[in-house]
Amino acid sequence: MVSHCQRGSVQSSRPDVKKRVAFIGQPNTGKSTFFNRITKANAAIANWPGLTVDLFRAVVPLQGELIEFVDLPGIYDLNGFSEDERVVQRFLANYAVNLVVVVVNAAQIDRQIRLLLQVQTLGIPAITLLNLADEAKRYGVQIDVAALQERLGLPLYPISAKYGTGCSRAMDAIGRAVKDQPEAYQIPNLVNVLSDHPVAIADMETALAGVVQMPSPNARTLTNVIDGVMLHPVFGLPIFFASMFGVFWVIWHVGLPSADPVDAVTGWVQSNILEPLFSPLPTILQGLLLDGIWTGFAALLSFVPLVAIFFIVMGILEGSGYLSRAAYLMDALMGRLGLDGRSFVLQMMGFGCNVPAIMGTRVMRSRGMRLLSMLVIPFSLCSARLQVFVFILAAVMPGTQGAIALFLLYLMSFVAAFTVAAILSRFHYFQARDPFVLELPPYRLPTFKQVFLRVWGEMREFVARLSMFMVIGSSLIWFLTSFPQGSTGLETFAGRIGSVFQPLMNPLGINPFLTISLIFGFVAKEVQIAALTVIYGLNNSEAVSDQIHSTVTFAQGFSYCLFSLIYIPCLTTLGAIWGESKSLAYTAISVATPLVTAWLFSFIFYQSFSWLGW
């Protein structure tokens, strides 16, 4: 059973954890959904020495033991060559596990059995979860679980990670398997083993013969009917962009008003609690705590509801299976730009945060395509930029016009990305093609719990990550806008720094105060709002909005948003680009290219509006 494995020991960051379970599966199998369900969305990103990726891990008490669960990247082949496949290979080679849990989409078992047979070939202790078993029955897939289990010699458990059916039984089985398996194993020669014992198509057919019956490939399903409209060569793209306009309409009309109650609460806390509490302190320390740290933190809190609504809407779209269709629709266009549908998927991922989208380029085998994708992904209208744009546009545009302007910025993010890709793909450094396989899952209705767990995980990471940046950034902003003592406005350190760049920003209609906020936006885009609050010397975002409304025109505000959309990525994204590219020169290119592009786009927009007299 373990002839190809080598005994090892589990070395965890927690000394009380002695056993480890690794989850393996193809993309879109529901592996991460099951992982989130059993860990109650309490998984944390952990760094693993020797791997080029951070993996989700969680420590779960199970049958009297603390067990470390690790969610490995979704892969199609354990013997493949993509970066994600190499990550899984290195993990199993270097980190001992007591058990491997293979998650298989029961509706696609004829295609996913290969990965299961590869795990079986390795001889490592494993059990299999047949996810979406209920969905498989609806599609006419018939599986004799007992017969298939006997043939494979591996325990099989039908589950529905989405609804929780069978999950308790599966967890009990995992607990028993780990308890009965005191030894941990790793496979240092994994690639050689799979190369010497390849899984052929005949092996897959033999494993399923007589125990699995698949429906006719020509069977007409509801998904096929819907795809006839959604993927229509004429109507497909208009439907997609109409859907995205709906997303930004909801964000504008539901998310924007949600900031007002939070502003009221943070204002009350400052006036009635913090100011009396800090009054005995020296004036300079009061300024740091109230005008610096608290102002930045309050600005972050005011946009938490808006970002949560954004993640809810995107979670529904993603859970329904629609976003992968968008990649299919855009594949032909992306191909002309030297990219493919995967790059578009990563652009969509960048709506949440650019960092995981940058890391997602590992699925591309071609280095040229990876580098080009990493260069254009930061143009995505991420949740951090979204806060800034909603804030500025609400101040300079009334009603639904602001939602339209927000949607135009979304479109401009693609225009900028496509323009840069079209130009740079002509250079040999970025030229390469890579086979592209896209799995189109059936349309599904996301459950409340599924969306909630997704949003909870995203928001927890969002607040945790940005709290640090807000405290540091707001403190730095307060210092630079408060010193030298007695100076105000452009006489401060921040004003002097902004004055250096102002000659470049004047043709864009961006005033000195906005210029200073852009400088601080390099740390994190959300800091721009805190920067404006501190720079204007006001204590809440509503007062800043009124100030911008009276001093900034629509053309100036939109030009500022357009520049902020495209210019230099935030510090965390740059760190991800450096880590993925392993090249300081390329990282410098990823700074210079968006800066030049942002200036040109904003210049053309603002000068055109000025020429028209708007």
From Swiss-Prot:
Binding-site residues, GTP 3: D71, L72, P73, G74
Superkingdom classification of source: Bacteria
Location in or out of the cell: Cell inner membrane
CDD domains per record: FeoB
GO cellular component, one term: plasma membrane
Domain named FeoB-type G: residues: 18-180
Entry-linked SUPFAM superfamilies: P-loop containing nucleoside triphosphate hydrolases
Keyword annotations from UniProtKB, A to Z: Cell inner membrane, Cell membrane, GTP-binding, Ion transport, Iron, Iron transport, Membrane, Nucleotide-binding, Transmembrane, Transmembrane helix, Transport
A Pfam family the protein falls into: FeoB_N
MF (Gene Ontology): ferrous iron transmembrane transporter activity; GTP binding
Membrane-spanning segments: 234-254, 297-317, 374-394, 404-424, 466-486, 504-524, 558-578, 585-605
Chain positions recorded as GTP 1 binding sites: G25, Q26, P27, N28, T29, G30, K31, S32
Binding positions for GTP 2 per the UniProt entry: G50, L51, T52, V53, D54
Membrane topology summary: Multi-pass membrane protein
Binding site for GTP: N131, L132, A133, D134, S160, A161, K162
Similarity comment: Belongs to the TRAFAC class TrmE-Era-EngA-EngB-Septin-like GTPase superfamily. FeoB GTPase (TC 9.A.8) family.
Record's function text: Probable transporter of a GTP-driven Fe(2+) uptake system.
Protein's recorded name: Fe(2+) transporter FeoB
Taxonomic lineage from the root: Bacteria, Bacillati, Cyanobacteriota, Cyanophyceae, Synechococcales
Gene for this chain: feoB
